[in-house]
Amino acid sequence: MAVLCTSCIKDRERGADLEVGDIIPDFTVTMNDGSVLNSELLRSGVSCIMFFTTQCSDCRETLPYMQRLYDEYLPQGVTFALISRAEADDTIASHWASEGLTMPYSAQKYRVIYELFASSRIPRVYICKDGVIRAIFTDTPENPIYEDMKAVIDEL
């Protein structure tokens, strides 16, 4: 029997540790729909950036909430960037299909983009306005996800 362990909340890796008030770093990713998303676009208006892997149970629980936010706020001009921490496109596509998710995502083979933002913990969601991080959500018991994220977006 093989056991696959991917770290979620308790991992500790190298990388940045951005905080509320920091400006998002420069980066560019290609989304699964072929569109290109970069920090310049994310610095114009309200944006929501999520790092995830589909092997992480906490991420799998958070993704449907992100889909609800995406469906509600994309028409209002909020930009969404769902970026894998380090996961192949075929694995993500399979999960998206099985869960009925429609949000574009960027499959990243390595943790390069993730490490511009954080050294540990997924899921990790950054809500930003004009490139400034206004809130950071990780899936911890004291940090409810959907209602709190919605409240922050509504304030911006």
PLM segments and residue spans:
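A short beta-strand-turn-helix
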Residues: 28-47
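Short pre-active-site segment immediately N-terminal to redox-active cysteine/selenocysteine motifs
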Residues: 45-47, 52-56, 121
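Hydrophobic beta-strand anchors of alpha/beta hydrolase catalytic cores
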Residues: 48-49, 80, 125
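Conserved redox-active cysteine motifs that mediate thiol-disulfide chemistry
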Residues: 51-68
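Thiol-based oxidoreductase modules, predominantly thioredoxin-like and allied folds used
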Residues: 76-90, 101-110
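Short, internal strand/loop/helix patches
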Residues: 93-130
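Thiol-/selenol-based redox modules, centered on thioredoxin-like
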Residues: 127-156
